[in-house]
Amino acid sequence: MVMPVDKQQLVDRALQLAEQTGWEGLQLTALANSLNIDVAELAKVVTQKDELADAWFDRADQAMFNTELAGGSNAAEKLELAIRSWLNALAPYQQLTRQMLYYKLEPGHVHLQAAALLRISRTVQWLRELAGLQASGSKRIAQELALSALFTTVFIGWLYDTSPEQTSSLKRLKAAIATFINLGLCR
């Protein structure tokens, strides 16, 4: 009898395989074979490789939700803790994470790019919630735009950060949050 697999098991195994093949070289048939399941069983859980990348980013979101933000005394500290936990969740596979994004950005993958924009928007909304940011009206719009820029800038820098424990990215995050505060957007 074949044991059913869940998406998280697939993500774990896909990451292991992609360590050898690169993300682009990862084949769903090879993933199924490595788990001793047939492709039909795999297709019940994921219908395309990008769903595995999305599940990987879902893990980062979950890590962010599970972070104890009570240690943050204000919105800026909570924001920093939330973003750090999101990045830390991806850190074990930083290079593969970058490869996943390259895959999404290929010219023929416009549908994946649109979904990626929605994911960024969703993550930014959660960051606002978790940090307790409560601006409304035009202040909220400015806050969301600035937070989107902060998040994507830090994330893109993190993708290429080779410093020990991504210390360069953490410095960039602190500087970006300081700018966010100076603009009066951290309320």
Question: Can you name each region flagged by the protein language model?
Answer:
Residues M1-V5:
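N-terminal intrinsically disordered/low-complexity leader segments
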Residues Q9, R13, L17-A55:
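Helix-turn-helix
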Residues F57-M64:
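Short, basic, alpha-helical segments at the C-terminal edge of helix-turn-helix-like DNA-binding modules
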Residues T67-G71, M100-K104, W158-T162:
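Secondary-structure edge/capping motif, primarily at the C-terminal ends of alpha-helices
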Residues E68-L96:
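Hydrophobic alpha-helical connector segments
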Residues L90-V110, S121-V124, R128:
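Amphipathic alpha-helical segments used for helix-helix packing
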Residues H109-L133, I141-T152:
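Amphipathic alpha-helical packing segments from all-alpha helical-bundle domains
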Residues L133-T179, G184-R187:
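Hydrophobic/aromatic-rich alpha-helical bundle segments in the mid-to-C-terminal region
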